């Protein structure tokens, strides 16, 4: 599920790059250019928000499992499984975030 | 459709759970290896067995192992001549549990090996997932 999210993130970045290219090549007036720029900003926001939400959900599941383990309601194996899953989601979220931020910085450094 | 790697962890975890239960039964058998009855001629502890079953988990679409049932070993009891024992019958023989230490030790070893194998699956999944995520890290 997260892999597909990462792919969609990369697609969004590609789309935003394309939008920028169209904007710069067409040399549209500033008033017209604000509309697509704000659309990309929303996409970027929503992608980051969704990413954070995903990571937080799995982290919460991991925490709930470890609390259940401490209370003796879950076996150690189940706690480890949940924690591993949470760790993996977090690692993936961090990597995707780094990649997205990197791409965003790449965009901001672009000479226009 | 769940991530196959995650499904592997889930399956391996069910194996770990099953082997833990098996070890619990072995521990019970070993601890009660000399548990005789209190009254004369009464039955001592009977060796417990555990059987596993493959159950389909619909959320991941794979077969997990789980404990089917706890059974009892119906083999005859060991008999020892000890007339002074409270559980001795009229001929002076005491019934001891049908627990064979060697069998229990072998079972324990097998449990350990199986647990290790399942744990190895979990480790492998972790390393494969880390490799995949590392693809994003490289510049």
Role assignments for model-derived ranges:
Chain B
Residues 1-139:
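Amphipathic alpha-helical polymerization modules
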């Amino acid at each position: 599920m997260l892999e597909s999210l990462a792919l969609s993130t990369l697609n969004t970045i590609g789309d935003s790059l394309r939008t920028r290219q169209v904007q710069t090549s067409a040399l549209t007036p500033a008033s017209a250019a604000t509309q697509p720029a704000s659309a990309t900003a929303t996409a970027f926001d929503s992608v980051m928000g969704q990413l954070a939400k995903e990571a937080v959900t799995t982290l919460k599941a991991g925490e709930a499992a470890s609390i259940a383990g401490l209370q003796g309601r879950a076996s150690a194996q189940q706690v480890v499984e949940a924690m591993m899953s949470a760790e993996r989601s977090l690692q993936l979220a961090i990597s995707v975030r780094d990649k997205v931020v990197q791409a965003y910085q790449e965009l901001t450094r672009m000479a226009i | 459709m769940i991530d196959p790697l995650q499904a592997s962890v889930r399956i391996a975890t069910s194996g770990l759970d099953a082997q833990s239960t098996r070890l619990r039964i072995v521990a019970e058998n070993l601890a009660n290896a000399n548990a005789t009855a209190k009254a004369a001629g009464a039955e001592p502890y009977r060796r417990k067995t555990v059987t596993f079953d493959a159950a389909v988990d619909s959320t991941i679409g794979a077969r997990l192992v789980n404990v089917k049932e706890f059974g009892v070993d119906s083999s005859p009891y060991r008999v020892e001549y000890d007339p002074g024992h409270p559980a001795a019958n009229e001929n002076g023989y005491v019934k001891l549990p049908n627990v064979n230490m060697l069998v229990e030790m072998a079972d324990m070893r097998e449990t350990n090996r199986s647990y290790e194998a399942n744990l190895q699956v979990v480790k492998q999944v972790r390393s494969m997932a880390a490799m995949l995520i590392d693809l994003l890290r490289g510049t």
